[in-house]
């Protein structure tokens, strides 16, 4: 019994990242002392008590983070310093549906190039984001167009995603007050519900957004509310898997809550979250030339 307790103690001493604050470390030692006083208990009872000590620390890292830190990690999860990904987009409507393939490059939160590769009629259509600015390119027009703010709410590629959805990246971190309003445990994960309320002078269209984030920073859902607090659309993760060395949502669906039969799915096919992306990729030349 003493050997088991010693191993338990050594485990925490060798893994200080599990106990991030002095308060939590103190609580741990209080629990160890209690276990010591109960060392004459049967092995089965001891194992149960040890699990109670260890269990809460599986998610201590996420628990110690603020709503802003949780959301920042969630946004960074599918970007990294720079990334390359291949995706499939499926648009569903009551009387038609369409599937497209896409390639995308990103660098940080401020730069992204997204290009359609199929079907043939859409191939080459692309969007470039640099900071607050966004340009589109259509091969048929043979020129790029900078999108004015009045067009940012329009549909991107006929989907349920808007240009604003593509461009906003860290907008939630800059223009919203964030707070964790609920926590729950589901399938071994702690789930955090975060409310995002825009600042009074924020240049945003939504009255509120609510995100549900898992303790490993996977964004499970994001619901958009209008100014009267009516939910308008929702982005939900349909499947989580490991891709590119990370556990991410590999299949997401954006649904129009006012039209349940209308939705758009985005599925990751390939991803490299440590891609070496050249500076020239995020230029108007690359946008229009395809190189």
Question: Across the structure, where does each feature detected by a protein language model lie?
Answer:
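Flexible, processing/modification-adjacent segments and terminal tails
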Residues: 63-84, 88, 97-98, 123-126, ...
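Extended lipid/amphipathic-ligand handling interfaces
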Residues: 74, 102-106, 236-242
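One face of beta-strands
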Residues: 83, 87, 112-114, 209, ...
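Bacterial N-terminal signal peptides that target proteins for export
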Residues: 25-46
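N-terminal, post-signal-peptide region of Sec/Tat-exported proteins
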Residues: 85-113, 117-120
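C-terminal segment of classical bacterial N-terminal signal peptides
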Residues: 51-59
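Gly/Pro-enriched, hydrophobic low-complexity segments
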Residues: 146, 167-169, 189-283
């Amino acid at each position: 019994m003493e050997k088991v307790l010693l191993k338990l103690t050594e485990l925490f001493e060798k893994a200080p990242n599990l106990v991030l604050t002095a308060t939590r470390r103190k609580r741990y030692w209080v629990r160890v002392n209690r276990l010591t006083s109960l060392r004459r208990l049967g092995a089965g009872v001891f194992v149960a008590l040890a699990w109670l000590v260890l269990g809460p620390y599986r998610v201590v890292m996420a628990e110690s983070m603020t709503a802003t830190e949780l959301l920042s990690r969630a946004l960074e999860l599918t970007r990294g310093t720079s990334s390359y990904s291949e995706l499939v987009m499926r648009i569903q409507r009551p009387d038609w549906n369409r599937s497209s393939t896409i390639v995308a490059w990103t660098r940080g939160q401020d730069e992204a190039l997204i290009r359609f590769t199929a079907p043939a009629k859409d191939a080459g259509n692309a969007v470039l984001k640099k900071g607050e600015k966004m340009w589109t390119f259509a091969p048929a027009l043979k020129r790029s167009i900078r999108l004015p703010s009045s067009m940012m709410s329009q549909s991107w590629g006929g989907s349920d995603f808007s240009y604003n959805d593509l461009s906003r990246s860290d907008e939630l971190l800059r223009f919203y007050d964030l707070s964790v309003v609920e926590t729950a445990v589901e399938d071994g994960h702690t789930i955090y519900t975060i409310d995002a309320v825009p600042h009074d002078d924020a240049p945003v269209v939504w009255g509120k957004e609510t995100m549900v984030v898992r303790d490993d920073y996977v964004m499970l859902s994001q619901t958009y509310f209008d100014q009267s607090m009516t939910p308008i659309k929702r982005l939900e993760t349909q499947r989580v898997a490991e891709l590119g060395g990370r556990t991410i949502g590999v299949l997401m669906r954006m649904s129009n809550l006012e039209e349940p039969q209308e939705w758009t799915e985005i599925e990751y096919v390939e991803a490299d979250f440590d891609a070496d992306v050249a500076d020239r990729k995020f230029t108007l030349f690359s946008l229009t030339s395809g190189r």
